[in-house]
């Protein structure tokens, strides 16, 4: 201090010659003098420079000169003055010749420089914006505690009278230090001009004082707010820049790319050297090197480079915590020595009790700081890895997309990323428990001598068993993840293709397939869990075996006596060893899971990407008349391993040209556009595009946003141009009818729009782009005749908005070819011919063959004109005045309702009030605590008998544990005769028997919880799947797919793993708490007085915490659903995103969604630490109470009983803290059960099968269909979409159904298949009302070929014969009939060929023919074709028509068509208008009437 006391007497620093009064002190006066003088300066000079360097690089602006800062500076300068005066006095005395020890000059000088450094730190902190300093807080605390203790002992020894001036100076300095310490507990004002931008709701951590940060009291405001009212997202704090995705992902991506490049160079060098040294063996080594060196290692290294500082800081906190952890056994040894010796004064026992309390508190604070740092690291790593996965999704090549379905990607971000980040908490568990074990053995050696060596043998003998178990668990874990992927992929396909499944009545078959995979998944999970239980019990048994063997050897072999100090200090050390041995299997278990997930992530991140060098592109555009697109001798393949799909393409397209691409199904039309986009792998050749590119895919992709955001697609809003685009794309009337106009949300996957509206919206997005090159993949296929003609004339054609731009149009509409500047005919992946329309007609080559196929055979008399003769000028007439007026009249003559209201729009109205609970893009959120019914639902799923059995087993093993500890206390109190205990063998034998019984009960109880959890998982998943699959089609149209996928992936994983794990831990710790409370109450009854208030405080903390934590968990789940939905949406539209060069805006959107999810996760993270820190601090009070009560009752208690009580009290802090945490975690996890039950009460479809109905096989025999005054509405509050429809279709009759968009054509098919139930009237088939027939019975007797052909992930045979009702011969015959036999025979595996999700590896025409083959195999009496030929070329359409005429000649056929050409062969045509049958008759009769059908034929160019 400024005025140090006299130096130590005697030799050295430590005084060994204290007088008798001081000898009774636990700490010598010389130690206090030395520590008080040197420890605070050493502390500041060691940490101060590091702290200065840190704040120099992490400044946050600067602080104003506040009153708090001024007070600190005044006190600091006052301390400097006092230290200076002490130095001056010492120098003056030396100058006067007064004999003084050197310490009287050295000590004040050291304190003077240290105080000056402290003042400098205070000033620097203000400059760098530090509001509260932990380093100075610790310094002022040390400056007060150690010198104050020294001064107090000197004062009690009459040292004050020896030099009153120096001691007055000391007390004055102590007073100033106390004032500085108090000020250091306060936080200064926020920084002025901070480097981070101002946030709307900043996290209070940055402005909290150091004590508040250490105890996490800055979280209390949020917890209290959550207790008073439900928390909302706006109540949560903003996310700091250091935690933002933009910052984290960019850093990780940069390091990863750098490491990958270095690894590739290294591997190439090694491969080159090995090739030179071993000849042909080099290629064998390269895959190994590529797998081991260039995949997982660079990513792991990058993660370490980015996040190592946070991890090391947390590890340092953990090491300091462990120092205090091992201080407790030493203090306990001294305490039991004090209890056993009646001579020492009572204050010594109280001092030891205080020291144990302080050590436990410091252990708590540092341990919670470690957990906080690692949790923050976990959150940051999650953001970074999710960002990497998202960026990879945007860069996947076509071959990689086939290998990774949407469900796989969702599984990666929802499960694998979570498991990988959770492993951060257990990384130190691989080495730190080993250090604990070594330290424990050192303690045991000190206590028991050579007998402790036997513990090493027992422990090491069990290690091979655990390594073997870990290896087996790894195998089963990988199997479970494989099955999880298969289930996720199939479940995703079911949810996305629910309409197709319901069309065919396949729900039951898909349920069986999913549940079969689920059964294998749970089987692997059960086996893995049982192995984990064996591992955990083996570690528990190893602890007991160590104690048993050590005690037995110590007492029986070495013939030593047991006493309380040996028994219970050993027991305390073994409890630490128990934690180490429990932590180790948890760490191994977590890291085994993380390794599997990490390998899967690395495999995905290393998939093949789109090569940006395939196309030589320029955004500047080309001059008029110059070539805009050039392809020279180019050959393309879908991936580097697959055979070429386009051969020797040579093509030059000048700027402003309209190029039409035609050809049969599978000719390579869409592949050509993909090649121009750079989506294909270029085998050879050259490709160049000048100017910005816009792309319209064949299958429209839209975002889950508003109409205007879909059209603008990240560009600035230009209202006049937007209006022109919407009008040209025939969207303006639709938009006008939407409830919020252009700001109306269209729902996920455009579920509020029809297929035609989605296609026009996709086209409008491209047109709005004002690009130089437009790649249009059959955009007119999903549009009816008049809308398609309008769109072509107004947008694509020579007089449209895109005139002057380069347009490559893939089309099957041959009647528009005369207006194209140039035509390419593709066949078998090569250009068959190209030229102008007239040139190709004159050649009479491939184009003429297509026109001949498209020309209808026979003399029908409809007056259909050949496309070549529809206009005199192949380019000019559409741009003239007269055709423009005719088109305008044709559009305006249609009533507004017909033009704007699609059937899908009618099905799911955008202004539906019921949709308020299901907004697009937002998940449902419950508020308040989880209801008891949810807990009961889970327990019922487990089974009441199994629940009671598990509780009984836990009780039995805990009774055995109590008896074992009590028996040890009796053993310790046995008197020794001749240095030995006569009953040692009996005591040891019963001790061992009780331990074995406890181990058996522990394994049985954990196995019971595990098996019960697996049973509950199976039932809850089965109910969720059943509830979703049994829902009507409207449920899928209004529920975002991401919300469903989240429940089938993340929530299911929580129910599978987290709930059984938390339940097992809760029961273990709850019964352990009962044991500890009983021990303390029996041994030291006075401690009961402290136990009851502590329990009340614990209950208060839990009540405050649980409500907020559960609500935060719900908000977190809902926010993460948005991340999954956006990830899935981007995966499906990545080609469009790349084509428009909008990767950066999409990455920004993903960053915003992930940041929002993390903004909600962070409060839950720190709330956990708030609970743990404060609950453990309260629990440490029980240690103090038990020790204090033991001192008070020292005369009445045996040493063994006191040891039993205090050692148990030392465990109550961790035990009670884990009870609260596991209960809270269990309630947080049980939210997943609540979310899985969200759809249990939604409306369901009619029964699939009815036990008694008239529709028994062979119904229907004839296929007669009769609509009687049929009416249909899609919602109860909506008007009828179809009304008053009455007609009869005779058995075997082929009837066409036509009409404008929204006329009600597809509604008739929906009513016939009962996708929507009749609102009035009904439908009869062969005289049987379909309302009296089960849904599956009805749908299995009707075949439908929908507009969008869907294939499911799985074999081709499964897609054709899902119910396995047909032989291979029958399937091959059906394929031959649809002319796909040769194609399938060429595929790898043939019928066992694995189809990609939604059949993306096949063309639309090929998929349509496969659907036709599927209908051939079903052999039903009724067939519905719902726009089945809209997306196929005329040749394929004629092929399908011919098969309908031959194979379905005896069937009743309903042909819903856009192309009137398709219905000209029908015996009768129904013309729908405004939901009613407007006209009915043969095509010739309807044309002669010159009514609505005639006008439609005019618009189609047929008359």
Curated annotation (Swiss-Prot):
Keywords: ATP-binding, Cell membrane, Disease variant, Endoplasmic reticulum, Glycoprotein, Membrane, Nucleotide-binding, Phosphoprotein, Repeat, Sensory transduction, Translocase, Transmembrane, Transmembrane helix, Transport, Vision. ATP 1 binds at residues 663-670. It is found in: Basal cell membrane. It comes from Homo sapiens (Human). Changing residue 1238 to H: In PXE; pseudodominant. This is ATP-binding cassette sub-family C member 6. One of its GO terms (biological process) is intracellular phosphate ion homeostasis. One of its GO terms (molecular function) is ATP hydrolysis activity. It is an enzyme of class 7 (translocase). Residues 1-31, 94-98, 150-167, 324-349, 448-450, 555-575, 961-997, 1083, 1197-1198 are extracellular. It is linked to Pseudoxanthoma elasticum: A multisystem disorder characterized by accumulation of mineralized and fragmented elastic fibers in the skin, vascular walls, and Burch membrane in the eye. ATP 2 binds at residues 1299-1306. Coiled coil: none annotated. Changing residue 765 to Q: In PXE; affects protein expression and trafficking; expression is reduced to less than 10%, when compared with the WT protein. It comes from the Eukaryota. The chain crosses the membrane at residues 32-52, 73-93, 99-119, 132-149, 168-188, 303-323, 350-370, 427-447, 451-471, 534-554, 576-596, 940-960, 998-1018, 1062-1082, 1084-1104, 1176-1196, 1199-1219. Expressed in kidney and liver. Very low expression in other tissues. In testis, localized to peritubular myoid cells, Leydig cells, along the basal membrane of Sertoli cells and moderately in the adluminal compartment of the seminiferous tubules. Residues 881-901 have a biased composition (Basic and acidic residues). Changing residue 1314 to W: In GACI2 and PXE. LTC4 transport is completely inhibited by 1 mM orthovanadate.
């Amino acid at each position: 201090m400024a005025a140090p006391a006299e130096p130590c007497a005697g030799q050295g620093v430590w005084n060994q010659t204290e007088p008798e009064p001081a000898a009774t002190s636990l700490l010598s006066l010389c130690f206090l003098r030395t520590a008080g003088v040197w420890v605070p300066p050493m502390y500041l000079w060691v940490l101060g420079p590091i702290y200065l360097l840190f704040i120099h690089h992490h400044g946050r602006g600067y602080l104003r000169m506040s009153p708090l800062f001024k007070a600190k500076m005044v006190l600091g300068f006052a301390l400097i003055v006092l230290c200076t005066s002490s130095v001056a006095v010492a120098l003056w005395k030396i100058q006067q010749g007064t004999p003084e020890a050197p310490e009287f000059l050295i000590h004040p000088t050291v304190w003077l420089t240290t105080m000056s450094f402290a003042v400098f730190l205070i000033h620097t902190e203000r400059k760098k914006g530090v509001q509260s300093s932990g380093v100075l807080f610790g310094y002022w605390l040390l400056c007060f505690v150690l010198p104050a203790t020294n001064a107090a002992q000197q004062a009690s020894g009459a040292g004050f009278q020896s030099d009153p001036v120096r001691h007055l100076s000391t007390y004055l300095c102590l007073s100033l230090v106390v004032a500085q310490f108090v000020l250091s507990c306060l936080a200064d004002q926020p920084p002025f001009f901070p480097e981070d931008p101002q946030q709307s709701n900043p996290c209070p951590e940055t402005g909290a004082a150091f004590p508040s940060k250490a105890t996490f009291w800055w979280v209390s405001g949020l917890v209290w707010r959550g207790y008073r009212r439900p928390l909302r997202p706006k109540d949560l704090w903003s996310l700091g820049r250091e935690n933002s995705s933009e910052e984290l992902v960019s850093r990780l991506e940069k390091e990863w790319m750098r490491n990958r490049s270095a690894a590739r160079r290294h591997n190439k060098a090694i491969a080159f050297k090995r090739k030179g040294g071993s000849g042909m063996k080099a290629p064998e080594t390269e895959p190994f090197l590529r797998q081991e060196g260039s995949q997982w290692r660079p990513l792991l290294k990058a993660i370490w480079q980015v996040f190592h500082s946070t991890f090391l800081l947390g590890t340092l906190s953990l090491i300091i915590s462990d120092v205090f952890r091992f201080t407790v056994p030493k203090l306990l040894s001294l305490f039991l020595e004090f209890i056993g010796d009646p001579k020492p004064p009572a204050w010594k026992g109280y001092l030891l009790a205080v020291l144990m309390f302080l050590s436990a508190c410091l252990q708590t604070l540092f341990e919670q700081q470690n957990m906080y740092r690692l949790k923050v690291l976990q959150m940051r790593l999650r953001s970074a890895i999710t960002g990497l996965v998202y960026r990879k999704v945007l860069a996947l090549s076509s071959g990689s997309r086939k290998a990774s379905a949407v469900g796989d990607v969702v599984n990666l971000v929802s499960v694998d990323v979570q498991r990988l980040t959770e492993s951060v908490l257990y990384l130190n568990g691989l080495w730190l428990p080993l250090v604990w074990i070594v330290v424990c053995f050192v303690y045991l050696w000190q206590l028991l001598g050579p007998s402790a060596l036997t513990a090493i043998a027992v422990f090491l003998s069990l290690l091979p068993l655990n390594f073997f178990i870990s290896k087996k668990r790894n195998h089963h874990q990988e199997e479970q993840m494989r099955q999880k992927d298969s289930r996720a992929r199939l479940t995703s396909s079911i949810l996305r293709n629910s309409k197709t499944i319901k069309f065919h009545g396949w729900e039951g078959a898909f349920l069986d397939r999913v549940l079969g995979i689920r059964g294998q998944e749970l089987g692997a999970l059960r086996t893995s869990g049982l192995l984990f239980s064996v591992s955990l019990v083996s570690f528990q048994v190893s602890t007991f075996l160590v104690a048993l063997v050590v005690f037995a050897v110590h007492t029986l072999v070495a013939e030593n006596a047991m006493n309380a100090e040996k028994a219970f200090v050993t027991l305390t050390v073994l409890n630490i060893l128990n934690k180490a041995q429990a932590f180790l299997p948890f760490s191994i278990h977590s890291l085994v899971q993380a390794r599997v997930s990490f390998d899967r992530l690395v495999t995905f991140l290393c998939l093949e990407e789109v090569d940006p060098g395939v196309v030589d592109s320029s955004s500047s555009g080309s001059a008029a008349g110059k070539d805009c697109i050039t392809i020279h001798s180019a050959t393309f393949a879908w991936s580097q391993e697959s055979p070429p799909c386009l051969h020797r393409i040579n093509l030059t397209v000048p700027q402003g040209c309209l190029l039409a691409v035609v050809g049969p199904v599978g000719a390579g039309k869409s592949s050509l556009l993909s090649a121009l986009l750079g989506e294909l792998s270029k085998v050879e050749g050259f490709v160049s595009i000048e100017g910005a590119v816009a792309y319209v895919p064949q299958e429209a992709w839209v975002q889950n946003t508003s109409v205007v955001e879909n059209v603008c697609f990240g560009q600035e809003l230009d209202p006049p141009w937007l209006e022109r685009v919407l009008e040209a794309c025939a969207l303006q009337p639709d938009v006008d009818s939407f409830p919020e106009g252009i700001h109306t949300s269209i729902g996920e996957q455009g579920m509020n729009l029809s297929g035609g509206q989605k296609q026009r919206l996709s086209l409008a997005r491209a047109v709005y782009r004002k690009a130089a090159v437009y790649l249009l993949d059959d955009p007119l296929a999903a549009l009816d005749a008049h809308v398609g003609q309008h769109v072509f004339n107004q947008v694509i054609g020579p007089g449209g908005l895109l005139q002057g731009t380069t347009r490559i149009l893939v089309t099957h509409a041959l009647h528009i070819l005369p207006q194209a500047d140039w035509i390419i005919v593709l066949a078998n992946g090569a250009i068959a011919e190209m030229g102008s329309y007239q040139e190709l007609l004159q050649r009479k080559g491939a184009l003429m063959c297509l026109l001949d196929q498209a020309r209808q055979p026979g003399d029908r008399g409809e007056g259909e004109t050949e496309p070549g003769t529809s206009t005199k000028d192949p380019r000019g007439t559409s741009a003239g005045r007269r055709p423009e007026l005719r088109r305008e009249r044709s559009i305006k003559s249609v009533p507004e309702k017909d033009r704007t209201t699609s059937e899908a729009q009618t099905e799911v109205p955008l202004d539906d009030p019921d949709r308020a609970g299901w907004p697009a893009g937002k998940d449902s959120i419950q508020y308040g605590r989880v209801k008891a019914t949810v807990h009961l639902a889970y327990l019922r799923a487990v089974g009441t008998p199994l629940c009671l059995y598990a509780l009984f087993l836990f009780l039995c093993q805990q009774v055995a544990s109590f008896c074992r500890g009590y028996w040890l206390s009796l053993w310790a109190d046995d008197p020794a005769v001749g240095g030995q205990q006569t009953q040692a063998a009996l005591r040891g034998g019963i001790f061992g028997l009780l331990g074995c019984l406890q181990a058996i009960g522990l394994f049985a109880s954990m196995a019971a919880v595990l098996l019960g959890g697996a049973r509950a998982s199976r039932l809850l998943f089965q109910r969720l799947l059943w509830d979703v699959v049994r829902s009507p089609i409207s449920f899928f149209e209004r529920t975002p797919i991401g919300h469903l996928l989240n429940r089938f992936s993340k929530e299911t994983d929580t129910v599978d793993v987290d709930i059984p794990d938390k339940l097992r831990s809760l029961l273990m710790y709850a019964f352990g708490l009962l044991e500890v409370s009983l021990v303390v109450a029996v041994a030291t009854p006075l401690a009961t007085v402290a136990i009851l208030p502590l329990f009340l405080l614990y209950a208060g903390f839990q009540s405050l915490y649980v409500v907020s934590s559960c609500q935060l968990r719900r908000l977190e789940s809902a926010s993460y659903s948005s991340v999954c939905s956006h990830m899935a949406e981007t995966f499906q539209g990545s080609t469009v995103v790349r084509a428009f060069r909008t990767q950066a805006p999409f990455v920004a959107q993903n960053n915003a969604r992930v940041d929002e999810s993390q903004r909600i996760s962070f409060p839950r993270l720190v709330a956990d630490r708030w609970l743990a820190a404060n609950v453990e601090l309260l629990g440490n009070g029980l240690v103090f109470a038990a020790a204090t009560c033991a001192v008070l009752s020292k005369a009445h208690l045996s040493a063994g009983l006191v040891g039993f009580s205090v050692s148990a009290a030392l465990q109550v802090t961790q035990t009670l803290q884990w009870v609260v945490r596991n209960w809270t975690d269990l309630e947080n996890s049980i939210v997943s059960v609540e979310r899985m039950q969200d759809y249990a009460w939604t409306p369901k479809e009619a029964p699939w099968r009815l036990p008694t109905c008239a529709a028994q096989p062979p119904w229907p025999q004839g296929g007669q269909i009769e609509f009687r005054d049929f009416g249909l509405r899609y919602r109860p509050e909506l008007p009828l979409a179809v009304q008053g429809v009455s007609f009869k279709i005779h058995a075997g009759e082929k009837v066409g159904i036509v009409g404008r968009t929204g006329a009600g054509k597809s509604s008739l098919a929906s009513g016939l298949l009962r996708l929507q139930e009749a609102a009035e009237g009904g439908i009869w088939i062969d005289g049987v009302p379909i309302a009296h027939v089960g849904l599956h019975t009805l749908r299995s007797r009707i075949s439908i070929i929908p507009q969008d052909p869907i294939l499911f992930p799985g074999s081709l045979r499964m897609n054709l014969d899902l119910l396995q009702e047909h032989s291979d011969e029958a399937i091959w015959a059906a394929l031959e009939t649809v002319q796909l036999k040769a194609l399938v025979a060429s595929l790898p595996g043939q019928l066992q060929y694995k189809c990609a999700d939604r059949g993306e590896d096949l063309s639309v025409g090929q998929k349509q023919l496969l659907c036709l083959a599927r209908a051939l195999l079903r052999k039903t009496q009724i067939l519905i074709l719902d726009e089945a030929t809209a997306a196929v070329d005329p040749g394929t359409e004629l092929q399908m028509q011919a098969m309908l005429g031959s194979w379905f000649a005896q069937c009743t056929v309903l042909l819903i068509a856009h192309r009137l050409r398709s219905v000209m062969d029908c015996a009768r045509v129904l013309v729908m208008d405004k939901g009613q049958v407007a006209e009915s008759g043969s095509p010739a009769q309807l044309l002669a009437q010159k009514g609505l059908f005639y006008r439609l034929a005019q618009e189609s160019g047929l008359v």
